[in-house]
Every structure is written in C-alpha cells, then in structure tokens.
C-alpha cells in the first residue's frame, strides 16, 4: 500500500492519477481541501493533518510500505513563518518518524530548489550547492531546507529515502493559488513582466520521476527536477499566445518592485489579506537563477522531459475547456 500526503494539491493529484493508472493501491491524506473524485476502488482517502501524530499512526496501520510526502505549506508572506516551520519541518519529522516506526520500504520527499544554496548570477545551481543563511532570501526556503534535514536524519536511522527539488511546477491546478496562478494572471491580461529567469517543469514529469525513483534502488540522494531555464517574460508570452491574450508589455524594474512590495505590506497590515507581492517574491521574480538538471538524467537515463512550450499549450487547453464549461 502506498501513502500520498498532500493528495489534493497540484502534484499530489497528478501523482495519485499516475499511481492509479498503474493499478496501485493508494491511501491519500489531505488537510483542508478534499481530493477530487477519482472514482477508483484502489483509492482510500483520510482527512489527516501531518501535525497529528496519532492520526498518522492510524493511517500507517493500513499496511503502508511506500510514502510520497507532497504535503507542505508554500508561502512567501513573512507573517506565516511560524506556520511554515511547523508544517514543513515538524510535519516532515512526523512523516519520517511514522515511516521508521512502520518499517516502510521507501520515502520520496518533495522538497524544493528553494532549499538549495545560491550562486552568482548565470552560474547553474546543482544539488551540491549547500543552503546558507547568508544566501537565503525566504522563510519558505529555510523551512524546506530544515525539512530535508529531518529526512537525512531518517536516512541516518535506517530509512530508505530520496528527495526531489522541483523548480516551478506548471500544470492545470487551482488557478487562484500556487504556481497555476501564473496562467490566471496572463489570462486576465496583467500587464507586467519581469526579465528574471527560473527553472520550470511539467507536473506530469515531476510525478513520473517520483514514481521511477521510488521503484528504483536509488536512496540517500537529492535531485533537481527541472525541464528548462526560462525567463518569466518568455513564459508569460507563451501563455498569452496560447490563450490569444495580450502579451504583458510593461517591465518591472527593481525600483518599482520595491515600491509595490512595501505598499502591499502596508495594505496587508490593514486588510488582513495576503499581499500580492512580498519582498521575497519580488527578489525571486527579478533574480536570474539557472538550474542544472544533469544529475537526474544520469540516474534515470531513459527519462525525457516535456518541452515547456508543449506543457503550456496543453495546460492552457485544459484551462480553456474548464472556462468553456462554466
């Protein structure tokens, strides 16, 4: 039996889809958002918070042998630091402990490239680049790095585990939240773009890689999962063209970004709403960050990434269908 945490998220949902397609029995847990209806007798779902140790023990009694840990909080709002640390560190520690206690055969833990260190601009980041406090610009990155340390602790205590560090995951998820928000912004003809560069990857590729790593003998390794390094301008242009919408034409400068995130922080203090832009997201949007994906290809030589252009065209097609059905 396989356990998937964070089953209602973009990646968790895709992972469950692929596992069920392989006729594998899956137990999925979720916290606030219920899972979509997979309509499969192979799937069992439980409402269980990863901070609930007793609840996790009950779930593990289903005869769990493999764990895919996708559950996490993603936020770049400085006010949510406590929540980030609680869920991404303590929650991961609970999963590791549950796996050790149940004697699972393997854990695949979803980390993030935010848990890696930073280099000078234009130098590609690989898995050996260590996270440092000086190079860190987000509480999220720190929480994911410390979450990885919990997995390494588990490995030290005899757990077989691998960690995946995806870049920005693209797919047809909830376009009011997460990385799928990029599609909504462009659809709404948001006029701004940044010339920052980042890694991007199809959600289907991330799920496929995770399953291949789980079914391999590979353990005690971390892998960057990234198809291509692209500028946000290129990504926005591809999405706009696929939707037949106006391409964003106003460039965000560092000076403008500073003004906007300060205004958003001020507004958030009074409204209690999440800021649209924070100091952390502004820094990320302007940074030119390149990722080296060669380690994964070395370990899984048969694997080929989808092109990001293909991903965007297909994802826009799914969103367009959803919009037409409303």
Over which residues does each language-model region extend?
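NAD(P)H-binding glycine-rich loop region in Rossmannoid oxidoreductase-like domains
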Residues: 44-90, 94, 98
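Conserved Rossmann-fold NAD(P)-dependent oxidoreductase catalytic core, especially the SDR/UDP-sugar
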Residues: 90-139
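Conserved beta-loop-beta element that borders a ligand/cofactor-binding pocket
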Residues: 111, 148-172
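Short-chain dehydrogenase/reductase
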Residues: 85-89, 126-129, 136-148, 168, ...
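Conserved catalytic-site region of short-chain dehydrogenase/reductase
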Residues: 76, 113-123, 169-175
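Mid/C-terminal beta-alpha module of Rossmann-like enzyme folds, strongest
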Residues: 209-276, 298, 307-308, 313-326
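N-terminal Rossmann NAD(P)H-binding glycine-rich loop of SDR-like oxidoreductase domains
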Residues: 2-22
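Substrate-positioning beta->alpha
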Residues: 146, 177-178, 194-214, 220-221
């Amino acid at each position: 039996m396989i356990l998937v945490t964070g089953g209602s998220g973009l990646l968790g949902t895709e992972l469950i889809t692929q596992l069920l397609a392989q006729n594998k029995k899956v137990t999925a847990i979720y916290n606030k958002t219920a899972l979509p209806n997979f309509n499969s007798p192979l799937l069992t779902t439980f409402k269980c918070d990863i901070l609930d140790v007793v609840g996790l023990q009950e779930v593990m009694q289903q005869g769990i042998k493999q764990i895919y840990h996708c559950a996490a909080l993603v936020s770049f709002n400085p006010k949510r630091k406590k929540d980030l640390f609680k869920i991404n560190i303590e929650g991961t520690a609970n999963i590791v402990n549950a796996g050790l206690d149940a004697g699972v055969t393997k854990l695949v833990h979803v980390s993030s490239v935010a848990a890696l260190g930073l280099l000078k601009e234009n130098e590609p980041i690989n898995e050996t680049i260590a996270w440092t406090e000086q190079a860190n610009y987000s509480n999220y990155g720190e929480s994911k790095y410390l979450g990885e340390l919990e997995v390494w602790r588990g490995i030290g205590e005899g757990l077989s585990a691998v960690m995946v560090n995806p870049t920005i995951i693209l797919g047809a998820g909830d376009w009011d939240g997460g990385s799928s928000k990029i599609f909504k912004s462009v659809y709404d003809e948001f006029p701004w773009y940044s010339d920052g560069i980042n890694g991007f990857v199809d959600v289907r590729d991330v799920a496929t890689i995770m399953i291949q790593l789980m079914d391999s003998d590979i353990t005690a390794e971390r892998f960057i999962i990234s198809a291509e390094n692209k500028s946000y301008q290129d990504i926005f242009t591809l999405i706009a063209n696929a939707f037949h919408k106006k391409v964003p034409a106003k460039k965000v400068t560092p000076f403008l970004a500073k003004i906007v995130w300060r205004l958003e922080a001020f507004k958030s203090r009074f409204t209690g709403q999440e800021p649209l832009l924070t100091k952390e997201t502004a820094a990320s949007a302007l940074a030119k960050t390149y990722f080296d994906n060669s380690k994964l290809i070395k370990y899984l030589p048969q694997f080929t990434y989808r092109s990001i252009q293909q991903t965007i065209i297909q994802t826009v097609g799914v969103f367009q269908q959803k919009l037409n059905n409303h």
